[in-house]
């Protein structure tokens, strides 16, 4: 059973954890959904020495033991060559596990059995979860679980990670398997083993013969009917962009008003609690705590509801299976730009945060395509930029016009990305093609719990990550806008720094105060709002909005948003680009290219509006 494995020991960051379970599966199998369900969305990103990726891990008490669960990247082949496949290979080679849990989409078992047979070939202790078993029955897939289990010699458990059916039984089985398996194993020669014992198509057919019956490939399903409209060569793209306009309409009309109650609460806390509490302190320390740290933190809190609504809407779209269709629709266009549908998927991922989208380029085998994708992904209208744009546009545009302007910025993010890709793909450094396989899952209705767990995980990471940046950034902003003592406005350190760049920003209609906020936006885009609050010397975002409304025109505000959309990525994204590219020169290119592009786009927009007299 373990002839190809080598005994090892589990070395965890927690000394009380002695056993480890690794989850393996193809993309879109529901592996991460099951992982989130059993860990109650309490998984944390952990760094693993020797791997080029951070993996989700969680420590779960199970049958009297603390067990470390690790969610490995979704892969199609354990013997493949993509970066994600190499990550899984290195993990199993270097980190001992007591058990491997293979998650298989029961509706696609004829295609996913290969990965299961590869795990079986390795001889490592494993059990299999047949996810979406209920969905498989609806599609006419018939599986004799007992017969298939006997043939494979591996325990099989039908589950529905989405609804929780069978999950308790599966967890009990995992607990028993780990308890009965005191030894941990790793496979240092994994690639050689799979190369010497390849899984052929005949092996897959033999494993399923007589125990699995698949429906006719020509069977007409509801998904096929819907795809006839959604993927229509004429109507497909208009439907997609109409859907995205709906997303930004909801964000504008539901998310924007949600900031007002939070502003009221943070204002009350400052006036009635913090100011009396800090009054005995020296004036300079009061300024740091109230005008610096608290102002930045309050600005972050005011946009938490808006970002949560954004993640809810995107979670529904993603859970329904629609976003992968968008990649299919855009594949032909992306191909002309030297990219493919995967790059578009990563652009969509960048709506949440650019960092995981940058890391997602590992699925591309071609280095040229990876580098080009990493260069254009930061143009995505991420949740951090979204806060800034909603804030500025609400101040300079009334009603639904602001939602339209927000949607135009979304479109401009693609225009900028496509323009840069079209130009740079002509250079040999970025030229390469890579086979592209896209799995189109059936349309599904996301459950409340599924969306909630997704949003909870995203928001927890969002607040945790940005709290640090807000405290540091707001403190730095307060210092630079408060010193030298007695100076105000452009006489401060921040004003002097902004004055250096102002000659470049004047043709864009961006005033000195906005210029200073852009400088601080390099740390994190959300800091721009805190920067404006501190720079204007006001204590809440509503007062800043009124100030911008009276001093900034629509053309100036939109030009500022357009520049902020495209210019230099935030510090965390740059760190991800450096880590993925392993090249300081390329990282410098990823700074210079968006800066030049942002200036040109904003210049053309603002000068055109000025020429028209708007």
From Swiss-Prot:
Q: Which residues bind GTP 1?
A: 25-32
* Record's protein name: Fe(2+) transporter FeoB
Q: What is the lineage of its organism?
A: Bacteria, Bacillati, Cyanobacteriota, Cyanophyceae, Synechococcales
Q: Where is the protein localized?
A: Cell inner membrane
**Which family is this sequence assigned to?**
Belongs to the TRAFAC class TrmE-Era-EngA-EngB-Septin-like GTPase superfamily. FeoB GTPase (TC 9.A.8) family.
Q: Which residues cross the membrane?
A: 234-254, 297-317, 374-394, 404-424, 466-486, 504-524, 558-578, 585-605
Does the record bear Thylakoid in its keywords? no
Q: Check the record and name the InterPro entries matching this protein.
A: Fe2_transport_prot-B, Fe2_transport_prot_B_C, FeoB_GTPase, G_FEOB_dom, Gate_dom, GTP-bd, P-loop_NTPase
Positions contributing to GTP 3 binding: 71-74
